[in-house]
Amino acid sequence: MQRIAVLTSGGDAPGMNAAVRAVVRCGLKAGLTVFAIRRGFEGLLEGRFEELSDYSVSGLMYAGGSAIECARCPEMLEPHGPEAAADILKRREIDGLITIGGDGTFRGALKIAECGIPIIGIPGTIDNDIPGTERTIGFDTACDTLSWVIQRLRDTAEAHHRTFIVEAMGRHSGWLALYGGLAGGADVILVPEVPWKPEDALATIRRRMREGRTFHLILIAEGAGRAIDLVSWLQEHTSGELEIRASIPGHIQRGGSPTTLDRILASRMGQHAVSALLEGRTSIMIGEACGRLVEVSLAEATDGCRMIDHELYQLALTV
């Protein structure tokens, strides 16, 4: 193996740059030529390859986003997309590809692997919903950001006796809402994995009002419903008794300098991915379990969605 490439695909996540940095520097140390593919699979199909040096990744440890850029690529869902991608990699004499992203990225990677390309996946998504790993790059930073948002909304909610409905990212799982809400002190956390009714949220608010609370914070994962819809329902069923606002942090949750935990996780996974390629272990994702790195087949990593820890959810309901 002499030439490898790395790409970031799908939604960006804090720590992707740290992973790219580790891949490049570990690859160069092993005597490899390392290329970045700009804008993920879209850039792969367009031939946007760029050789990287040790200096070119200097400073990436601290940077949010992705210096080599991300994109979603619908063509990878079509039969011709992965075949064309594999042909381009072969013509470029790329001996191995490292993909950093979430479930969509790994589905594309698996299809390219089936065309004969050695591939390693590194989980980079703020959703933390990839089977086979307990943590994904970017999740810790996004949790910090979301809890930061909730803490500041609490200040104004308390000052004005308001109820805030905060909408967190998470289409299929509620990991971000659960961790961010628990750390931020949300009164109610609504996630896709747990059926809920608006009446339950209102009952919690009324109970807290009887206890003397004058403000309330409800966190809802986007996959569990829309904040604006819950605001409308509560306004309709409280007859103006509550002053209610919706707050949608949106893509703020994706941004910012990665936390120390994300930087270290990304660096470890990047190094492990290069080692696995060199040792011939491919069509796998690098995951983490009990603090140790593990190797999981891409087939397993794309098999469904990792659901929340229900014991932790019960704790969130209690405290």
Predicted regions and their residues:
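N-terminal phosphate-binding or glycine-rich loops at protein starts, especially the Walker A/P-loop
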Residues: 1-45
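Short glycine-rich or small-residue beta-strand-to-loop segments that form or flank ligand, phosphate
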Residues: 3-10, 66-71, 96-99, 164-167, ...
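Short Gly/Thr/Asp-enriched flexible loops that form oxyanion-binding sites at enzyme active sites
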Residues: 18-23, 104-117, 177
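Short, acidic/small-residue loops that bind anionic groups at enzyme active sites
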Residues: 35, 113-140, 145, 190-197, ...
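Glycine-rich oxoanion-binding loops at beta->alpha junctions
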Residues: 44-99, 105, 137-148
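Accessory alpha-helical/coil subdomains and C-terminal extensions
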Residues: 99-101, 107, 111, 139-246
